[in-house]
Each structure stands twice: as structure tokens, then as C-alpha cells.
């Protein structure tokens, strides 16, 4: 049986009174083992279907052939688990579902015939099978324990001396256990029934005194079933120990649907913590089974419930789960969540083994091997006499086994496992040198307790059980709870004649569980030395008294007399004077103690007299809810007005705290060192989370949404433009913690804060699928930012659940999104993929923008260079005309009216008359002047040609002119376009001169390209010379050109520097090398405006 999956069954109950009053519709249907649910808000969508091991339809009556009764549920699940318990396996059955879904009814049931739940039927069947299997070699023993887990505290329900919370510990051999939890020996089903009844009474009394609700606590009823077998051949005793755990989980409900607030909301948070941890454990185990993630970390110790159920979930146990469903459409979200929970659970596989002694296991395996070999020999035709001889030898060997067998090897304690990052202490002697004396003493005492408990005989256990039973009866008698004539405590029965009080509780399982007799004469109620002892905040030492006075006609009249200052209500009205009670009256003492007065004899006499019932009691059942509603109505308390007043107070408080947060954020924005948007948003996120979380502790998510929408979120007052492009995430600093030591829990909390902030900024328009996608995206982003692994695969699910619990989801949008998506986790995965694709698209766009920044810069450089080059031919034409005319034209001063009038003519090139066909040199010269693209290409070619000739010439031939004609152009290896700028020191010498010495040596043109003397030619560009100041330069450019500035015409174009970037004018050095200088040059108006144009005229030494 090892390696079997968890058995999962779902059961749907009938409508309750609340659902019937609201005209609820059934949205759950079952066909065989398939359960389907329809979204009431998206009725056109296909229903979601789930398949389980069992689907029980209990929505109708017993006349329906499809109706599943309590007996059928036990036959399918209970009998199978009980069979595993007899085989020696651990067994666990737990019920899960929302409050009021029928978990307690399925597990415990009622006292009426045919209404018993799984637990009573299993206990009764256990003892019936034990009585049927009695033999001399077999003996059985049964021990039970009953505990309650409320707000992460463990309470023993069978030990009246246990007052506080018990500690949960983990032994490396025994596993998790509750320290000092009583285990009582029982010998019959009646003993178990009495103990269960006592446990329920203790649970009811404690819940009433502390104003608790049993539906908010987990109940665990454990049966330890031991089978001892004596082997006559070996003379050894073997034991098989089975642990049967029957768990009734607390209700999984939403705070907004239950109206919880204050302490109830805190209880719900603890319930959600335990149930959420249970969901995490189930998800982690399911992922391990599906081979999605192999992780050794299972968060068992995150809650007491999962810690105690560690062996039952994925461990050494046979486990079954019953999911209780509500069929109403108003509970659609809770029902769908329960179905998904159950669907996840069925993927878990448990590795159960038989719990028996090692020697017994060895002997059993050897006996099975002998039987198998004997059958093999018989099949091969071995004679019967030979088999008899083998039997004789086998018997002699078995007889010698006790003498030669070694003692059982001690079970070596396994190494302690690591949970939540801390090492669980072990009992191995290697660690005793590392612990302190106090811890060593505590471990020693605990080990001695365990040894004493294991060595305790059965008779001692029975005596201990009897002593505890007497103590419980004495305690109940002291409290005024009725006791049977045979000494057993009261179950659910009503006396025939005696007037009495029966308790009412919010949980139906705890209603009518306590019965208080009203004796003849005076019965006092209070806290100390009273006939009926009650405790609580509003119960006085002497609260009230009941007078039972017989009348002459035989009728007994009971009168209630309240004490001064004590709050006592009858049928919702405050009682200040003695009042005669009628059967069926509702009595409220203090705030928490609610009773119904029953007078059987009075009711019988009224029926005999034909007295009509009073008009007061309604047709609905008189339970705790009716008593509370009646109390509020009679006291004139309008629940709606009270809730509105409370909401207004909370809204005013939120508004005040928001204003304080706004002032704080504004101060931080003004005086902080950094005023970036990220820092401001981060501070706003933290303040928003603080206010929303404090508000959520007192109100449901829907009300929180209303208040936040109305009042807004804290802000520093600085408006931020919406970001259109995905920004690469920067590392955030976690509040109060070094990011280097950030854990996965810190990242989850940070993700919850940021997602809640984003959802609140969007006016809570996010649906369930959108929140899941945000959670997955945010967790990946944070893990990548902080260098953490992606963590558990369902980490984003926990984040999404926390966001739902905090801010809820869109009203109707969440259900719609859930209905339109794929079933279960598929829809979330699709949304996750979509969000991931959007994120990758954004990152790709950002990378494109970053990579194209240099291209944009180069394009801007090219555009500006083209605009500058349009000026260069004009300056060259003016220079040619001036030199051909032999005089320097007058240039008006800069800024004068003449300069403004001359500017348009300077910009336009002068018209040239048509000329005869040009030679190749003239054509090249014309293109160099008129075509900037041709000029750039030819200048680049000349530059490469000069460098090549300079390399060929060598160091010895640089004194004279170059005589070799230019050869074929060899393109360089690096053809990247370069822009030498005069303002950059590294580029000033990028085109060095070809000659050596103080004066540059011009190149002589080769003979092949020497122009014909008869052909008129324009003056080619002058060779590279030293810089000369312009007319508008800072060092005075008004000097006239001398006569010695004439130069012989060079035969080759020399490359010139040109600048495409406008640069501010820089002063030239005062000391210049001696030599002839050019006459003053008038800068064109466009160049004067740019102020950074390259020098178009350069001064050079005369050749």
C-alpha cells in the first residue's frame, strides 16, 4: 500500500435558513465522481469540472436515489481507513470547507439515529471488530486524546487540570507531539462516547467564557490502536501500533462575507494562517509529486496544525480528505476555492509503512519466504514425506531462535531536519556538549516522561483514566452541569420533569451541549460559591437567582430574580424585577452566556389544557442567532446605524492619519538628499501599506476599498508623469533590513506591499487574474533584483492570496476574470505568460532605444556637418575672386546696416556664364566646389593616399617633394567615419603634414595629371597651414594681408580640417611663428552667427 495517493471526497449539503431566506440558487452539480460548478455572474461560460475519488450529493432529501447519507460516506471512507489501521498503518481523515458547509456534521454528526458522523461510526466499528477477532494470541488496546487548536494555541480537552496552552515539540524518533497531552485508555465505545462528550463540554465552556467560537478552532481526536500478537513457535511478542487522527478543521471564510471585525478578525487571521500554511504544504507536496520542483523544504512548522499533521501529509500515513461544499450562488468564491484546494490535495502521495517491531517484521518476512518456497516445492512434485522432514527441521530451527537471536538493534535517531532555517534540536549525545545545563535538564525530564509513559502498564493507564474521569465529573458538578444517575456526564438529553437551562452557541455542535438543573427552592448563579458557576467579563459574583416554587395544583413555577447591577435579559428585554419564566424563553446573562429555559412539565400541562402558543416565538428555530437578533431588536439597537457610525469613525481616523502621512512625505521630499521619483514612490508605498493594513485589521476588504477610494492614498504632492516605457528595475531597500540579508519572506512581503499600492492606485479595478499576474511578475522582478533564486513555484500564489486578503478584488470583475480563464492554475499560468511577454516586449523596446542613442547622435552630427559644408564653397569662391582681382574687397563692420544688406548676396552663389567643355581636372575642381559628398570622398581618398605615400617614402626622402605618381587606392582596414574637431586636442594632429622641418614641403603633382598651360584653371585649395585669427576673433583680426602673402599654386589638393560642431571662439596664443600672413578676411554672416565655424583661411609659410 506504500506510495498511494490521498483519497479525496467532496460533499454538498442542503440550503440552510440564511441561504433560503436570500433565495439562493444551486450552482453545484454532480455526475458520478465529477463535480461541476457554474459561475452565477458568468452563466454563459462553461462550468468548471473537477474529478475526485468520491462525489456525494446530499443537497436533496433521502427520497432522492442520488442522496448520499452518513452511512454511505462512512462505508466508502471510514471502513477503508479502519482496515488500514488494522493492517498497522497510520490513518488520518480531515474535513475542510467554509464555515457552515457541513464539516462538523460529516465528522461528528448528531445523536439521532442515522445521523452519526464518521468519528462515532468508526469508533463503534473499531470495537465491534475487536470483539469479533478475539483470540488467545491477539490482544488489543485503545487510547484516545482530544485537543483543540485555537489561535495557534493547543488546549487539552480531556484533562481538567490543563489550563494553559500546551507546547508542541518534535522528537527525532517519535516525530511531532504535544507535550503533557493526556492519553486515556478506553475499553468500549461507550467510554469513547463519554470522552468525546466531555471534550465537547470542555470546549463549549472554554469558548463561552472566553467569547470564542468553535468553528474558529481546529479539533483533533486521536486514537492510538495497538495490536499485540504472540508467536507460539518463536515465543516472541510483536506489536503493531496505528495512530488514527480525525481532524475537524476550522471554517475557511472571508472576513467580508462573515462580517468579522476586531477580535473575530484576529481569529480569522490565525485561521487563515494555519489553513494557508496547510495549502502551502499541500502545494509543495503536490509539486514534488508532479516533478515540477524537487525541494526538501516543506513549511510544516509555519503553523501548529501542519506541524502536528506532518506525518499525515506526505509521510507515514493513509490519508483521506472530505471537502464540504455550499451549493448556494452567494458562496461561489468559497466553494470554488474549496474545490481547487481538494483538486490540489489529490496529487499528494503518502509513503505509509506498517508500524511494527523490527524483529516481528523480520520473522514475518521469513515466514512468508518459507511459505512461498514450500508452495514452489509442492508445485515441483516434492513428496509429502520430504515436506514433513523439512517441517521438523524448521521447527527445531525456530525453537533455537530465542537462544541465538540477538537483541533488537536500537533505532538510530535520524538526523534532525531543518525547518524555517533553524536546526531542530536532536537527542543524540553528540550535541549534549553544545547545550546549556537548563536545556539539558529539560530534555532529560522530557525523555524520562516518554520512557515512563512507554513503560506504563495497561492497568496503570486505566487507573489514570478513571481518576481523570472523576475529576471531570467533580468539575462539572461544581459548575452546575447535570450528571446522569449512573455517574456518567450528560450527553444530549432532556430531563422528563425537572426545569433546566440548556446552552445556545454560535456553533451548532456546541449548542445544547451543557445542561443546568434548577432545583427546588433557590438556585443561585454567579462566579464564586454558586449553584451554577459562570465566568466572564460581565458576570458578577452573584448575578441572579432562580426560585422554583411548587403550586397547590402540582405545577412548578420558576421565577427569575436579577441582582442589582447585573445584566440579565429575557427574550431580549432587560430584567430589573422578578419575572416568571415560560418554557422556551431565551435568557442572556452578561454578553456571552445564552440559554434556553425548558420546563417539560409546564409544556405538557399547557398541551393538555389546549393553551395556544404565545405569539412571540417565531417559526424559525430558536438558536443562538435568533437570540442575538432578538436582543438587539428589543434594545433598540439598529445594527445598520451602528455599523455606519463605526465606519464613519474609522474613515475620519484614516483621513487624519493620511494628512499626517502627506505632511511627512512632503517634508521628506523637500529635505531629503534624493528627490527621485523612485524614492518618493517608495515612501508613498510604505505609508499607504501602513494605513491600509491598519484599516484592514478592523474592516473587510470591500469596506477598505470604499474608504481608500473616498479619501485617497498618502502622497508627497509631487505629480509623476505616467511611464510609457518599461524601466529597468532598480534595487529597492527593504525597510529596516539590509538587502544583502533579505529572505524570501521579506521579498514576499515587499511584493504584497507594492502590489497593494498599485491596486489601490488603480482604484481597485484589478481582477483575480490580474493580481495573480502581478504577483508572479513582481516576485520574479524582486528575486532578480536581489540576486535570489526564483524560490518556490507557488510563491506568487501566496503573494496573490495575501493581496486578496488585504485589498480584495474588483467587485464582479474578479469573478468574471476567474470564470473566463482556464480551469484552476491554467488560467493563472496563461496570464503569467502574457504578463511575461509584455515585460519582455518592454525590455526589448528599452534596449532598442538605448542602442539607437549613438545612431541618433551620429545622425545629428551628419546633419550639422551638411549645414556647415554649405558655407564652405561660398567662402572658397570669395577667396578665389579676391585673389584674381588682386585686391581685397571692403567688408563692412559686423553688425552694421551694410553688413545686413550684404548678407543675402553673400549667401547666394554668383551666376557664372556658360563655359566650354571642361577638362577632367576642371571637372574635378568643379565637383569639389559644388558637391559636398564628392568633396568628402575625395578628401578621404587623398588622406589615405598621402599616408600611403608617406609610408613608402621612408625617413630619408622626406626633404624634397614627392615625385612618385599616386598609385591604386588601397582601402584601409578601418573604414569607420571619423570627425576630427579642432576643439579636441586629440584630433588636432590627426592629419599631420607630409614634410619635415619647420616649413612644410608641398607635394608636386605627377606629370600625368599636370594641367595644360593654355587651359584656364581655378585656384585649387591651399595647402594645410597654421591657423590665423578670423576677423571676429578675440585677438584682433583686423590686420591687413601683406604683399608677400602670394604663394605659388600647388598642383595637388591638400586635406583640410573641417568642423561640424559649433564651438565657442577660443583665443589664439599671442606668440606666433614668424612668417607672412594673409590679409584680413571677412567672415560670412552665417559663420558669424554660428561662432564656431572652422577657419576657412589659414596662414602658411611662403615656399
Swiss-Prot record:
Superkingdom, natural source: Eukaryota
Kinesin motor domain segment(s): 5-348
FHA domain boundaries: 523-590
Keywords assigned by UniProt, alphabetized: ATP-binding, Coiled coil, Cytoplasm, Cytoskeleton, Disease variant, Methylation, Microtubule, Motor protein, Neurodegeneration, Nucleotide-binding, Phosphoprotein
Segments forming a coiled coil: 359-388, 438-479, 633-674, 828-872
GO term, biological process aspect, one: anterograde neuronal dense core vesicle transport
Cellular compartments per GO CC: axon; axon cytoplasm; cytoplasm; dendrite; endoplasmic reticulum; Golgi apparatus; kinesin complex; microtubule
Biased composition regions of type Basic and acidic residues, renumbered to the chain: 1092-1103
Residues found modified as Phosphothreonine: 1083
Region (Disordered): 400-438, 808-828, 874-924, 950-1103
Phosphoserine: residues carrying this PTM: 295, 494, 674, 676, 915, 1033, 1092
Subunit structure: Monomer. Interacts with BICD2.
Tissue occurrence: Expressed in all tissues examined, with most abundant expression in heart and skeletal muscle.
Main localization of the protein described in the UniProt heading: cytoplasm
Gene behind the chain: KIF1C
Designated name of the protein: Kinesin-like protein KIF1C
Entries under SMART domains matching the protein: KISc (SM00129)
Pathological condition linked to this protein in its record: Spastic ataxia 2, autosomal recessive: A neurologic disorder characterized by cerebellar ataxia, dysarthria, and variable spasticity of the lower limbs. Cognition is not affected.
Localization terms from the record: Cytoplasm, Cytoskeleton
Compositionally biased residues, Low complexity: 893-910
InterPro entries tied to this protein: FHA_dom, Kinesin_assoc, Kinesin_motor_CS, Kinesin_motor_dom, Kinesin_motor_dom_sf, P-loop_NTPase, SMAD_FHA_dom_sf
Amino acid at each position: 500500500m506504500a506510495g498511494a495517493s490521498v483519497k479525496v471526497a467532496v460533499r454538498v449539503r442542503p440550503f440552510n435558513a440564511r441561504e433560503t431566506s436570500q433565495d439562493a440558487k444551486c450552482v453545484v452539480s454532480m455526475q458520478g465522481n465529477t463535480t461541476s460548478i457554474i459561475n452565477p455572474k458568468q452563466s454563459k461560460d462553461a462550468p468548471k469540472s473537477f474529478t475526485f475519488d468520491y462525489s456525494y450529493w446530499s443537497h436533496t432529501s433521502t427520497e432522492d436515489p442520488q442522496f448520499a447519507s452518513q452511512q454511505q460516506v462512512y462505508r466508502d471512507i471510514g471502513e477503508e481507513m479502519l482496515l488500514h489501521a488494522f493492517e498497522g498503518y497510520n490513518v488520518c481523515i480531515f474535513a475542510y470547507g467554509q464555515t457552515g458547509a457541513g464539516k462538523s456534521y460529516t465528522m461528528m454528526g448528531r445523536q439521532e439515529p442515522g445521523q452519526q458522523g464518521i468519528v462515532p461510526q468508526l469508533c463503534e466499528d473499531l470495537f465491534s471488530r475487536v470483539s469479533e477477532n478475539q483470540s488467545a494470541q491477539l490482544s488489543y488496546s485503545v487510547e484516545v486524546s482530544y485537543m483543540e487548536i485555537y489561535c495557534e494555541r493547543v488546549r487539552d480537552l480531556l484533562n481538567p487540570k490543563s489550563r494553559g496552552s500546551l507546547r508542541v515539540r518534535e522528537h527525532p524518533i517519535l516525530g511531532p507531539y504535544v507535550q503533557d497531552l493526556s492519553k486515556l485508555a478506553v475499553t468500549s465505545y461507550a467510554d469513547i462516547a463519554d470522552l468525546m462528550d466531555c471534550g465537547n463540554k470542555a470546549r463549549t465552556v472554554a469558548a463561552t467564557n472566553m467569547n470564542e467560537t468553535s468553528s474558529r478552532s481546529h479539533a483533533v481526536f486521536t486514537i492510538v490502536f495497538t495490536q499485540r500478537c504472540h508467536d507460539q513457535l518463536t515465543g516472541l511478542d510483536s506489536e503493531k501500533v496505528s495512530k488514527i487522527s480525525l481532524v475537524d478543521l476550522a471554517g475557511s471564510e472571508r472576513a467580508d462575507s462573515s462580517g468579522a471585525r476586531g477580535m473575530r478578525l484576529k481569529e480569522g487571521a490565525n485561521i487563515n494562517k494555519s489553513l494557508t500554511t496547510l495549502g502551502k504544504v499541500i502545494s509543495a507536496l503536490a509539486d514534488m509529486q508532479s516533478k515540477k520542483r524537487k525541494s526538501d523544504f516543506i513549511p510544516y512548522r509555519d503553523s501548529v496544525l501542519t506541524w502536528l499533521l506532518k506525518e499525515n501529509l506526505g509521510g507515514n500515513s493513509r490519508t483521506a480528505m472530505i471537502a464540504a461544499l455550499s451549493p448556494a450562488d452567494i458562496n461561489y468564491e468559497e466553494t470554488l476555492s474549496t474545490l481547487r484546494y481538494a483538486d490540489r490535495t489529490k496529487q499528494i502521495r503518502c509513503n505509509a509503512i506498517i508500524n511494527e517491531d523490527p524483529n516481528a517484521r523480520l520473522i514475518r518476512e521469513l515466514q512468508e519466504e518459507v511459505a512461498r518456497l514450500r508452495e514452489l516445492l509442492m508445485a515441483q512434485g516434492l513428496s509429502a514425506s520430504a515436506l514433513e522432514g523439512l517441517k521438523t527441521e524448521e521447527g527445531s530451527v525456530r525453537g533455537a531462535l530465542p537462544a541465538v537471536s540477538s537483541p533488537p538493534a536500537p533505532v538510530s535517531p535520524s538526523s534532525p531536519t531543518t525547518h524555517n532555517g533553524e536546526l531542530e534540536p536532536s537527542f543524540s549525545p553528540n550535541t549534549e556538549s553544545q547545550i546549556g545545563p537548563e536545556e539539558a535538564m529539560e530534555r532529560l525530564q522530557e525523555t524520562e516522561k516518554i520512557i515512563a509513559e512507554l513503560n506504563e502498564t495497561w492497568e496503570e493507564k486505566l487507573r489514570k483514566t478513571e481518576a481523570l474521569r472523576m475529576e471531570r465529573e467533580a468539575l462539572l458538578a461544581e459548575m452546575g452541569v447535570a450528571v446522569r444517575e449512573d455517574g456518567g456526564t450528560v450527553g444530549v438529553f432532556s430531563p422528563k420533569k425537572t426545569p433546566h437551562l440548556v446552552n445556545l452557541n454560535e456553533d451548532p455542535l456546541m449548542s445544547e451541549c451543557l445542561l443546568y438543573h434548577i432545583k427546588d427552592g433557590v438556585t443561585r448563579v454567579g462566579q464564586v460559591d454558586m449553584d451554577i458557576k459562570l465566568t466572564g467579563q460581565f458576570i458578577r459574583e452573584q448575578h441572579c437567582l432562580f426560585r422554583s416554587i411548587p403550586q397547590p395544583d402540582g405545577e412548578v413555577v420558576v421565577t427569575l430574580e436579577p441582582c442589582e447591577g447585573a445584566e440579565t435579559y429575557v427574550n431580549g428585554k432587560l430584567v430589573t424585577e422578578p419575572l416568571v419564566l415560560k418554557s422556551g424563553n431565551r435568557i442572556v446573562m452578561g454578553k456571552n452566556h445564552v440559554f434556553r429555559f425548558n420546563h417539560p412539565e409546564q409544556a405538557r400541562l399547557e398541551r393538555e389544557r389546549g393553551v395556544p402558543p404565545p405569539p412571540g416565538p417565531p417559526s424559525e428555530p430558536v438558536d443562538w442567532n435568533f437570540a442575538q437578533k432578538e436582543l438587539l431588536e428589543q434594545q433598540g439597537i439598529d445594527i445598520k446605524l451602528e455599523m455606519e457610525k463605526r465606519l464613519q469613525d474609522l474613515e475620519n481616523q484614516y483621513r487624519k492619519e493620511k494628512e499626517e502621512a502627506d505632511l511627512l512625505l512632503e517634508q521628506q521630499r523637500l529635505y531629503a538628499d534624493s528627490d527621485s521619483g523612485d524614492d518618493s514612490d517608495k515612501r508613498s508605498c510604505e505609508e499607504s501599506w501602513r494605513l491600509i493594513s491598519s484599516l484592514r485589521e478592523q474592516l473587510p476588504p470591500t469596506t477598505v476599498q470604499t474608504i481608500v477610494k473616498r479619501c485617497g492614498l498618502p502622497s508627497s504632492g509631487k505629480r509623476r508623469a505616467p511611464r510609457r516605457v518599461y524601466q529597468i528595475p532598480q534595487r529597492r531597500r527593504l525597510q529596516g533590513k539590509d538587502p544583502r540579508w533579505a529572505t524570501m519572506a521579506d521579498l514576499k512581503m515587499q511584493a504584497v506591499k507594492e502590489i497593494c499600492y498599485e491596486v489601490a492606485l488603480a482604484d481597485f479595478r484589478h481582477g483575480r487574474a490580474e493580481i495573480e499576474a502581478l504577483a508572479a511578475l513582481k516576485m520574479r522582478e524582486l528575486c532578480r533584483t536581489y540576486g535570489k533564486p526564483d524560490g518556490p513555484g507557488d510563491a506568487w500564489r501566496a503573494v496573490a492570496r495575501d493581496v486578496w486578503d488585504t485589498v480584495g478584488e474588483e467587485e464582479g470583475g474578479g469573478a468574471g476574470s476567474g470564470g473566463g480563464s482556464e480551469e484552476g492554475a491554467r488560467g493563472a499560468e496563461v496570464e503569467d505568460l502574457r504578463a511575461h511577454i509584455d515585460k519582455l516586449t518592454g525590455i526589448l523596446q528599452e534596449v532598442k532605444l538605448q542602442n539607437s542613442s549613438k545612431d541618433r547622435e551620429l545622425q545629428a552630427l551628419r546633419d550639422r556637418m551638411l549645414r556647415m559644408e554649405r558655407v564652405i564653397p561660398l567662402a572658397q569662391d570669395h577667396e578665389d575672386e579676391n585673389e584674381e582681382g588682386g585686391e581685397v574687397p571692403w567688408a563692412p563692420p559686423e553688425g552694421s546696416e551694410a553688413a545686413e544688406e550684404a548678407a543675402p548676396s553673400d549667401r547666394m552663389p554668383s551666376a557664372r556664364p556658360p563655359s566650354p567643355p571642361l577638362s577632367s581636372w576642371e571637372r574635378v575642381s568643379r565637383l569639389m566646389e559644388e558637391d559636398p559628398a564628392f568633396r568628402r570622398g575625395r578628401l578621404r581618398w587623398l588622406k589615405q593616399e598621402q599616408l600611403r605615400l608617406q609610408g613608402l617614402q621612408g625617413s630619408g626622402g622626406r626633404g624634397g617633394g614627392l615625385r612618385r605618381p599616386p598609385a591604386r587606392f588601397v582601402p584601409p582596414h578601418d573604414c569607420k567615419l571619423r570627425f576630427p574637431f579642432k576643439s579636441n586636442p586629440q584630433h588636432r594632429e590627426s592629419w599631420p603634414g607630409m614634410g619635415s622641418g619647420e616649413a612644410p614641403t608641398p607635394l608636386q603633382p605627377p606629370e600625368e595629371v599636370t594641367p595644360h598651360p593654355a587651359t584656364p584653371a581655378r585656384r585649387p585649395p591651399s595647402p594645410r597651414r597654421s591657423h590665423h585669427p578670423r576677423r571676429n576673433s578675440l585677438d584682433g583680426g583686423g590686420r591687413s594681408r601683406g604683399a608677400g602673402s602670394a604663394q605659388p599654386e600647388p598642383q595637388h589638393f591638400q586635406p583640410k580640417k573641417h568642423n561640424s560642431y559649433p564651438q565657442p571662439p577660443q583665443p589664439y596664443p599671442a606668440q606666433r611663428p614668424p612668417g607672412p600672413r594673409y590679409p584680413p578676411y571677412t567672415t560670412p554672416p552665417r559663420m558669424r552667427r554660428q561662432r564656431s565655424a572652422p577657419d576657412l583661411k589659414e596662414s602658411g609659410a611662403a615656399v
